[in-house]
Amino acid sequence: MKKIYLVFASAITLFLIPFLSHADDHESTSMIKVLLVDGQNNHDWKKCSPVMIDTLQATGRFIVKRAIVAKEEIADFKPDFGQYDVILSNYNGDPWLKETQHSFVQYIKGGGNLVVVHAADNSFPKWKEYNEMIGLGGWKGRNEKDGPYV
């Protein structure tokens, strides 16, 4: 099981290298604000998310806020995505409200960043913009008519 956590930590670090590699950028000393979204997943998010948080915080470059979005809390999940430099998704669950989806699309269109971890590519099979953001949606009834799928 520890190997799985090491793989998750390595994957997160790999995806976030662009944020760490701007040594000449005057903003390189500022903290990178991350919103980690989890709370539903077919993988063990309760163990994986803390490893991601620890890995990011160990660099001294990230401030991580965690949004645990349980089924019964979907209606209350309306974050101000614009407060964050990157959204880290370890979420594979029920669809967000249309209002939250719209807000998220606007965040991405405005230059926001998204890192999708493993099963998070499965989370919204019918949300076209999300599947365009991630480049490849998966599972949950998608097929070749929906575009590329795994």
Model-derived regions: residue spans:
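Bacterial N-terminal signal peptides
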Residues: 7-18
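Short beta->alpha connector loops
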Residues: 69-72, 92-96
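A glycine-rich, often tryptophan-bearing local segment used as a flexible ligand/cofactor-contacting loop or short
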Residues: 37, 94-150
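Positively charged n-region of N-terminal signal peptides that target proteins for export
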Residues: 1-4
